[in-house]
């Protein structure tokens, strides 16, 4: 047997073994293409911060209007307005800040783009506005679905909200407050205050000026009042009233329809008292202090 003839069986065995090796696996399939955007679906663009600065003299008028978000206003000693807005919107519903001069006064509005008349899912835009403003001014602040908060101001402040709370602190002059489905809280006011809320409580602390406030379906808590001789009128429907008069004096009348009634004022002279009414003279100023509720208790100290 020659050398070459000896290698022939080995070659045949190797060929058989190679034939038994499985073929290489096929390459993995390509990833699927991303789904096409759904028709009528609004894609959010994320949140962003925008800032504006505008000159405004002390004692000027300022209007601030928002639609879906809060307004927070703080007075400072600069003759300018510094606005910071936290905005969340989408490609189809943009939020734009519009500042307009009205002579020496200023109007600021967060303008919300309206969706087109088509079926689909839309992102609800939101804008939270924070402002530093001249301390002395005549301010008008209004929003929907958000809180209106104002502090450290002198002059006049009108705060309006729908589905939101109103918070006013350390203001001198005059304050008007109105909201629906939200509380009213006022603290440290050297100012008269009037207004109303529906489905919200009222909290008052350290109020020097005259008061005329009412609520529906909410309680009233008031501590350390004065009245400035202008009078105090607190009224609720379906809510209790609790008052600590503080420095407030005058002719006190408290009435309710259902609920207990208790008036214990140091130095007060009881003119008349029944189960659901009390007339007490508190020596001092000649002002009317009237507390009224339906379906709620009244406590006066």
Where is each model-derived feature located?
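Intrinsically disordered, low-complexity terminal regions
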Residues: 1-301
């Amino acid at each position: 047997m020659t050398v070459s003839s000896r290698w022939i069986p080995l070659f045949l065995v190797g060929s058989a073994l190679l034939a038994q090796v499985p073929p290489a696996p096929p390459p993995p399939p390509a990833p699927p293409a991303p789904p096409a955007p759904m028709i009528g679906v609004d894609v959010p663009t994320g949140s962003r911060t925008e800032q504006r600065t505008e000159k405004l003299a002390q004692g000027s008028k300022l209007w601030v209007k928002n639609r879906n978000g809060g307004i927070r206003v703080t007075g400072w000693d600069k003759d300018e307005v510094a606005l910071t807005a936290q905005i969340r919107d989408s490609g189809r519903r943009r939020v734009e800040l519009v500042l307009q001069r009205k002579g020496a006064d200023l109007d600021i509005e967060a303008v919300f783009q309206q969706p087109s008349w088509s079926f689909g899912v839309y992102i609800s835009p939101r804008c939270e506005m924070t402002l530093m403003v001249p301390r002395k001014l005549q301010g008008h602040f209004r929003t929907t679905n958000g809180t209106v908060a104002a502090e450290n101001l002198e002059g006049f402040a009108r705060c309006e909200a729908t589905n939101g709370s109103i918070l006013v602190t350390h203001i001198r002059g005059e304050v008007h407050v109105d909201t629906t489905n939200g509380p009213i809280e006022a603290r440290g006011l050297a100012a008269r205050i009037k207004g109303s809320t529906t489905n919200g409580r009222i909290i008052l602390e350290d109020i020097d000026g005259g008061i005329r406030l009412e609520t529906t379906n909410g309680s009233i808590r008031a501590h350390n009042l004065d009245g400035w001789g202008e009078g105090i009128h607190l009224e609720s429907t379906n809510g209790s009233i609790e008052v600590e008069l503080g420095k407030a004096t005058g002719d006190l009348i408290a009435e309710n329809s259902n609920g207990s009634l208790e008036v214990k004022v140091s130095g007060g002279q009881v003119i008349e008292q029944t189960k659901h009414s009390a007339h007490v003279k508190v020596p001092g100023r000649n002002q009317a202090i009237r507390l009224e509720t339906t379906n709620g208790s009244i406590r006066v100290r």
